[in-house]
Regions:
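Polytopic transmembrane helical bundles with strong interfacial aromatic enrichment
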Residues: 1-250
């Protein structure tokens, strides 16, 4: 992912047509093979772990009313099941937004996306009743689903046509180039928050999630930490893009 976004694009821009015609049909199918199957493997194993450890596990990660509440006999909390569905269906709203005219206004689309993410996390905590680790990993699952979708249903189909055009000595469709580039960039931006959700699963109850030394941070507002990490992760990627454009070859 980082090779494509921080290195490959800049190197490709220095190639002439004949070089691209020789290199791209040999290089890109090979790199994209490992790229897309790595994405598929990560998503499938992640979903399996989510089901086994969280949905079916006995560690108490899910709220008591995930199924019938044994304490009072009430039925399951439908907010939980609605939010689980949204976790894996939000990709279609994301795809709709970034196929619409709204995508041309990057700042507005980014703000709307962040607000929707905030609403999702807030609802997971206060309506579905998820604890930190549970809403943390479900946000990761949502990002991971979007990233895998981008790889298999947007980037790879577009790249197949782009590579074929270059191989035939033709100019690739500009819309396809833009689509593949945009979705790959989105995956790069989502990757940092996703990594956070995976590596901080054992930190529930520490200072970063409430109950530690950070003033005013408690279990009531620890969902804000996750949103700060999302924003910080996006900013880090933004700075990495700027840095990658300044690194030159010999």
């Amino acid at each position: 992912l980082y090779f494509f976004n921080f290195i490959n694009g800049h190197v490709a821009a220095t190639m002439d047509g004949d070089t691209k015609k020789k290199v791209f049909p040999e290089l890109m199918p090979r790199t994209l093979y490992w790229f897309r199957w790595g994405a598929a493997w990560t998503w499938v194993t992640g979903v399996v772990l989510l089901i086994v450890i969280y949905w079916m596990g006995t560690e108490g990660f899910m709220p008591d009313d995930f199924t019938t509440n044994e304490a009072n006999g009430d039925g399951p909390n439908m907010y939980i099941h609605m939010m689980l569905a949204i976790t894996f269906l939000a990709v279609f709203l994301y795809d709709f937004i970034y196929k619409s005219k709204l995508a041309s206004n990057v700042r507005l689309a980014t703000v709307i996306s962040f607000i929707l993410i905030g609403a999702y996390v807030y609802t997971l905590k206060y309506c579905a009743g998820f604890e930190y680790r549970t809403f943390n990993i479900h946000l990761g699952a949502m990002f991971g689903t979007m990233m895998a979708f981008n790889v298999w249903f947007r980037i790879w189909p577009a790249q197949q046509k782009i590579i074929t055009a270059i191989k035939n000595g033709e100019a690739p469709d500009g819309d396809l180039v833009a689509l593949a580039g945009l979705r790959s960039k989105h995956n790069t931006y989502m990757s940092i928050p996703l990594i956070w959700t995976m590596i901080t699963e054992h930190h529930s109850g520490t200072s970063l999630t409430g109950g530690g030394w950070i003033p005013y941070l408690s279990d009531n507002n620890n969902w804000i930490v996750l949103l700060i990490v999302v924003a910080l992760g996006w900013h880090i990627v933004f700075q990495l893009y700027k840095k990658s454009a300044k690194i030159k070859g010999f």
